[in-house]
C-alpha cells in the first residue's frame, strides 16, 4: 500500500513495504528519487535497521543461537503499518513480533518512521523505542537515491558533491567485501567539492568519518540546482552509486553505525551500535533533505 502527501513544492509517496519513499516530485512534476530500475539497483530510499552494512559471515549470535542477517538489516524488506497520512505528514510503524524475534532479532522494538514536508524540505525522522525487558542495541542509517542527471541536457560531469566547508574526510576501508578492514585513508584533502564521474564509484562507496560539515549536497554546476542533506550530528556519511555508466543516481547516506569488521565477534552484544536502549527508553534521529530544483 502507498500513501501520498503534497504541498506547493513537493509530492511525496511512501510505500508501506519497507516504509520506503518511492517517489518525490517537484512542482513541475519532475521525479527526484531514483525509480528502482532492477537492472541497476532495485531500491529507492531504504531504511537501514537494525544494522548498517554487512555482518561477518552474514550471521550473528544471541544466547548461543545463530541468526541470519542480510545487508543493512531487515526493516527495508518488511511490511510496516501505516499510522497516519494527512496534511504534511506520513507516519508508519514496525513492531517486533514472535516471527521477527524467532527468525531475525530476538528483542522487542518499535521503529516509527515519520515523513514531513516543509517547503522544499523533506524531514524523515526515525524513532526507536524499547518496549521490552532487555537492553535493545541497534544500528541505523539512511540510504536515499537521487536521480542524476537532473535533466537530459546535462551529463555526469556537470555535477559534484559539496560540503559546506573544506574537508579532509577519513575514509574507512570496507573493500572488497563490505566489511571494515581496520584500515583508513584520505581520498581528498582540504576539498569542498568532489567531482562526480562515471568511474568515481568503480570500487564501491566511500564511508567518511571526521566530517565537520553540516551538509552534503549534489550540485549541478553553474545553475544553482541542488539537493542537500543535513548530516550534522551523524558520525558517518557515505556517498555511493551503482557501477553503471553513465551514472544514473547518487546516494548520500548519513549513518549512526558502521558495517561490521572482518574480525568482529559473532555475539550481537559485542557489536558496536548506534545506541543501546534500556527498557522503556527511546531514541530518534532525523534526516532533512532540501530540493532546490
Feature names for model-found ranges:
Residues 1-8:
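Short, Gly/Pro- and small/polar-rich lid/capping loops
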Residues 5, 96, 101-151:
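Acidic, contiguous internal or C-terminal segments within carbohydrate-active enzymes
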Residues 11-66:
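Acidic-aromatic substrate-binding/catalytic surfaces of carbohydrate-active enzymes
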Residues 14, 60-68, 126, 275-292:
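Short Pro-Gly-centered flexible turn/kink motifs
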Residues 66, 70-119:
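Extended, loop-rich substrate-binding clefts of extracytoplasmic carbohydrate-active enzymes
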Residues 83-90, 116-121, 150-153, 220-222, ...:
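A short, structured loop/turn motif at beta-sheet edges
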Residues 148, 152-232:
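Active-site/ligand-binding surface loops and adjacent short beta/alpha elements
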Residues 226-293:
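Active-site pocket scaffolds in enzymes
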